[in-house]
């Protein structure tokens, strides 16, 4: 291809902008406007006549502002019309019936405010463990009764089933001894799986035998410390069995013609289901031992729904009375807990049975301190303080069930009954754990009096004060009692010698102190904690509780000037000696500061404290720190930096940024934030001075620019550095620091050759060329207004950049280099205009410096011709079959560039554009729709006064037809 000269067309930017502006259309009042609130008319319609095609309606309308999606409803929707035609009396009756049904359902279903058993299960298993050896009886199975004829009479079948059960009770089992706790748990899991397998293979009697065997284990208290966990494991099997039986009977009521509703009555159940249900209850009734008979029947209690409406309400009192026959108080209380659990699942409205369980328990409560239990504890070598904590899981559950939506009078009666019993610390603790926090809080002084009267043997008072503190964290006591409550509690807590007992109580009461008192009281509490936890480095064993204390304090003190004026707060932080814990605490503090600090601050107390906190976080970073952790720490430190403002004292602000740079040099995102902050500071200075810098402010902005220039090279990310060089150069230019701006731009140009072929983006390696193209396009936009340095040649920076682009090693099949050259052509065309498209205030760009000088324009055109030659040479290399589509696309792109920026009155340039048009279509690779729209645009432009020469060009641009 021949060499083509370049001639830029003269642009009148103001006229072009005016021609592109959208036409302003006056909007009359009442017309639609996208930001106008939408109103929907709600029509209440009364139907008068349905005959014929005409019907009259009367409606009243009301308008309201609603969401845009509602605007599609115009008038009355069909459902409203049906509702309007309904008979009012029938409608009222239906609504009343629905309301009664809903109220009934509300009483028969436990709400989400009731804490389920599953929440407590994991805690019990984790807490009640043992290292002693355990034993278990495993069911070995029996072959008796499997052979027989199908013609056996019903009575013989029943006899056979009973014999099978007798066979089980007579010894078809194997006792495994000396099991560890984990072995025991594994065996229980095996039994659970055996139950499911037996059921799936239709061996119902075997399944029942397994459940009976498991239930018997609940009468064994030989390893008493493990009993609560054993109860959880065994009742899981019972729950599985109860669910299998219920679903089996329920499935019998479902056939292809009918489906049993969720709230069915016994009349809905068929005879087969009822007979099967009775059969299960008869089998269970034949179990001789009390404990397995009780547990297995309780597990299928829900099946009574198939037999009678009153079945459950009749069975619950009977089962409650059965528990009276269990002599061991621990076994008895857990049996009551299971019955309450099943009762709450199937009939939560039957409160009488729950209450009866509680009052029966109170009658037998003194057994806990009786001789039988004491002798058992002596045999097992268990002390009373270790024995009594076995009761709370069961007692707390019973109390929770009873107190759920219970009237105030019942709770008061229960509290009074507990008060009358001697040695009632255990009861009192369960009352405070299960009753509503509001109930406890309003009677705080009464409970403190009861706690004082408790005998401390077996159940220490500090645990009672801890339970009271947990309630007071949720509900407020009477204002007049608050200080006295704190004093009474802290008298007991501060006397505790054991650091673990002390911190477990103190952690709870810190929240009460923060909630209701000032920093003076909080400081006193923190000082007491430091006093108790410092000796023998006791704090090392209590980091979780100490962390909770910090979280509670910062949750209630959102004013950080007040928080850091608490004298003992920072010494409290010094107890966190373990680095990982200390960093977590610092993260909590910074997170709270970012969330709750509303206004920027310059308070020296806050700044010094938080700089120390941030420094602690920063210094924890090492070579093994994960990227996610670095991001989190950087986010928190950046949040702090953004909230520091010294107002108009810009020099102090810059000093803070200098100090921060020295403290946080290992976190790149923090350094990036500091550079942005300093650039913003320079621009704020410019804004204050309205662009007219004094000698002092000029020196200050140069200091800001120098800060950025020094900091950027320390960053690792190459595109981060490139973009910050560009951004900082723009800031320097805006503040008339021309030599510093040149230094930034030169640094950016010298960095381009270092851009690697692939870069890491979010953990994935991606080609870098598209990112480089984006950066260079932004750079070109800035270079338009950068004035030439008087000691260097014309367009020195552009020439340097072109040399770098030329020498850069591009991908073999990449066209990014040519796209960049096309952008350079746009830049040079803009530089040749008499007046540039945009300027920086008080900075003379080349249009002012050269004033359209012919030498400058000649140099500019020469560069354009060089760039064009590079583009045309690349197009020539794409004449291969596999690259024809790329050639077509690039050719059309270059054509559009010439059309937009070139002076097509020049014959050679005009001919080049025609050649490019033909090249784009030569091999049928062009997008016809794009070509058509381009030609339409040319014809439209040709109608403008100074663009008539495009008419002739349009005639020379044929459209390729496809046949």
From Swiss-Prot:
Cellular localisation: Membrane; Endosome
Membrane-crossing residue ranges in chain numbering: 703-719
Protein name stated in the entry: VPS35 endosomal protein-sorting factor-like
Lineage per the UniProt record: Eukaryota, Metazoa, Chordata, Craniata, Vertebrata
Residue positions, PTM Phosphoserine: 265
Region (Disordered): 43-69
Family: Belongs to the VPS35L family.
GO terms, biological process: endocytic recycling; Golgi to plasma membrane transport; protein transport
Disease: Ritscher-Schinzel syndrome 3: A form of Ritscher-Schinzel syndrome, a developmental malformation syndrome characterized by cerebellar brain malformations, congenital heart defects, and craniofacial abnormalities. RTSC3 is an autosomal recessive form. Affected individuals show cranio-cerebello-cardiac anomalies, coloboma, microphthalmia, chondrodysplasia punctata, complicated skeletal malformations, periventricular nodular heterotopia and proteinuria.
């Amino acid at each position: 291809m021949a060499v083509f000269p370049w001639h830029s067309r003269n642009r009148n930017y103001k006229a072009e902008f005016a021609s592109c502006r959208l036409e302003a259309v006056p909007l009359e009042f009442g017309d639609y406007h996208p930001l106008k609130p939408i109103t929907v008319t709600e029509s209440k319609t009364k139907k008068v006549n349905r005959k014929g095609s005409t019907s009259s309606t009367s409606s009243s309308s009301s308008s309201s502002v609603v969401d845009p999606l509602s605007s599609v409803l115009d008038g009355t929707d069909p459902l409203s019309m049906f509702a309007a035609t309904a008979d009012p009396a029938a409608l009222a009756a239906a609504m009343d019936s629905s309301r009664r049904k809903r109220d009934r359902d509300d009483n028969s279903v436990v709400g989400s405010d009731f804490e389920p058993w599953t929440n407590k299960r994991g805690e019990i298993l984790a807490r009640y463990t043992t290292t002693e050896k355990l034993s278990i009886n495993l069911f070995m199975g029996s072959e008796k009764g499997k052979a027989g004829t199908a013609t056996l009479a019903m009575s013989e079948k029943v006899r056979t089933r009973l014999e099978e059960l007798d066979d089980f009770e007579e010894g078809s089992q194997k006792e495994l001894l000396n099991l560890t706790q984990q072995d025991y748990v594994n065996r229980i899991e095996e039994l659970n799986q055996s139950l499911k397998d037996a059921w799936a293979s239709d061996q119902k009697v075997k399944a029942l035998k397994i459940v009976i065997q498991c239930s018997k284990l609940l009468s064994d208290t030989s390893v008493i410390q493990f009993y609560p966990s054993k109860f959880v494991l065994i009742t899981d099997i019972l729950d599985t069995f109860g669910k299998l039986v219920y679903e089996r009977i329920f499935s019998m009521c479902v056939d292809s013609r009918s489906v049993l509703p969720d709230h069915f009555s016994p009349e809905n159940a068929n005879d087969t289901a009822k007979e099967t249900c009775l059969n299960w209850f008869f089998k269970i009734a034949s179990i001789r031992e009390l404990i397995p008979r009780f547990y297995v029947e309780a597990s299928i209690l829900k099946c009574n729904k198939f037999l009678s409406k009153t079945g459950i309400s009749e069975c619950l009192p009977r089962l409650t009375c059965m528990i009276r026959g269990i002599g061991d108080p621990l076994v008895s209380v857990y049996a009551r807990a299971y019955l309450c659990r099943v009762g709450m699942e199937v009939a939560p409205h039957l409160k009488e049975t729950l209450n009866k369980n509680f009052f029966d328990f109170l009658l037998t409560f003194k057994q806990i301190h009786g001789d039988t239990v004491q002798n058992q504890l002596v045999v097992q070598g268990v002390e009373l303080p270790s024995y009594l904590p076995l009761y709370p899981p069961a007692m707390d559950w019973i109390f929770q069930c009873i107190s759920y939506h219970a009237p105030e009078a019942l709770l008061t009666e229960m509290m009074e009954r507990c008060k009358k019993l001697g040695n009632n610390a255990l009861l009192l603790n369960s009352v405070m754990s299960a009753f509503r926090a509001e109930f406890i809080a309003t009677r705080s002084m009464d409970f403190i009096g009861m706690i004082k009267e408790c005998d401390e043997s077996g159940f220490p008072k500090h645990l009672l004060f801890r339970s009271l503190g947990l309630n007071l964290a949720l509900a407020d006591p009477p204002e007049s009692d608050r200080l006295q409550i704190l004093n009474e509690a802290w008298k007991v807590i501060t006397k505790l010698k054991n650091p673990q007992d002390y911190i477990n109580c103190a952690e709870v009461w810190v929240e009460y102190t923060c909630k209701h008192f000032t920093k003076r009281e909080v400081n006193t509490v923190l000082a007491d904690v430091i006093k108790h936890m410092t000796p023998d480095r006791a704090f090392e064993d209590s980091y979780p509780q100490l962390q909770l204390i910090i979280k509670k304090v910062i949750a209630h003190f959102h004013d950080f000037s007040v928080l850091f004026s608490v004298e003992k707060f920072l010494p409290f932080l010094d107890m966190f000696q373990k680095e990982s814990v200390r960093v977590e605490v610092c993260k909590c503090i910074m997170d709270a500061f970012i969330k709750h600090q509303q206004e920027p601050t310059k308070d020296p107390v806050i700044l010094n404290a938080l700089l120390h906190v941030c420094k602690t976080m920063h210094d924890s970073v090492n070579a093994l720190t994960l990227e996610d952790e670095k991001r989190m720490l950087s986010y928190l430190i950046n949040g702090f930096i953004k909230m520091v403002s010294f107002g108009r004292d810009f020099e102090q602000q810059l000093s803070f940024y200098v100090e921060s740079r020295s403290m946080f040099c290992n976190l790149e995102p923090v350094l990036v934030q500091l550079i942005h902050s300093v650039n913003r500071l320079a621009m704020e200075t410019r804004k204050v001075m309205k662009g007219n810098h004094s000698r002092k402010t000029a020196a200050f902005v140069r200091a800001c620019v120098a800060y950025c220039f020094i900091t950027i090279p320390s960053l690792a990310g190459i595109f981060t550095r490139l973009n910050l060089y560009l951004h900082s150069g723009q800031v320097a230019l805006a503040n008339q620091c021309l030599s510093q701006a040149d230094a930034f731009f030169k640094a950016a140009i010298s960095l381009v050759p270092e851009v690697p072929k692939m870069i890491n983006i979010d953990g994935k390696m991606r080609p870098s060329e598209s990112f480089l193209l984006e950066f260079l396009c932004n750079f070109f936009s800035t270079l338009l207004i950068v004035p030439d340095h008087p000691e260097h040649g014309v367009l020195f920076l552009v020439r340097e950049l072109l040399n770098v682009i030329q020498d850069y090693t591009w991908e073999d099949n990449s066209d990014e280099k040519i796209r960049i050259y096309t952008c350079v052509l746009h830049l040079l065309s803009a530089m040749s205009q008499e007046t540039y498209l945009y300027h920086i205030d008080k900075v003379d760009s080349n249009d002012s410096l050269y004033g359209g000088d012919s030498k400058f324009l000649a140099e500019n055109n020469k560069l354009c011709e060089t760039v064009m030659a590079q583009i045309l040479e690349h197009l020539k290399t794409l004449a291969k079959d596999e690259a024809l589509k790329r050639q077509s696309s690039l050719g059309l792109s270059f054509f559009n560039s010439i059309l937009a920026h070139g002076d097509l009155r020049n014959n050679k340039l005009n001919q080049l554009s025609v050649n490019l048009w033909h090249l784009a279509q030569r091999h049928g690779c062009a997008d016809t729709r794009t070509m058509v729209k381009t030609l339409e645009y040319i014809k439209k432009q040709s109608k403008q006064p100074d663009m008539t020469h495009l008419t002739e060009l349009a005639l020379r641009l044929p459209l390729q037809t496809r046949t």
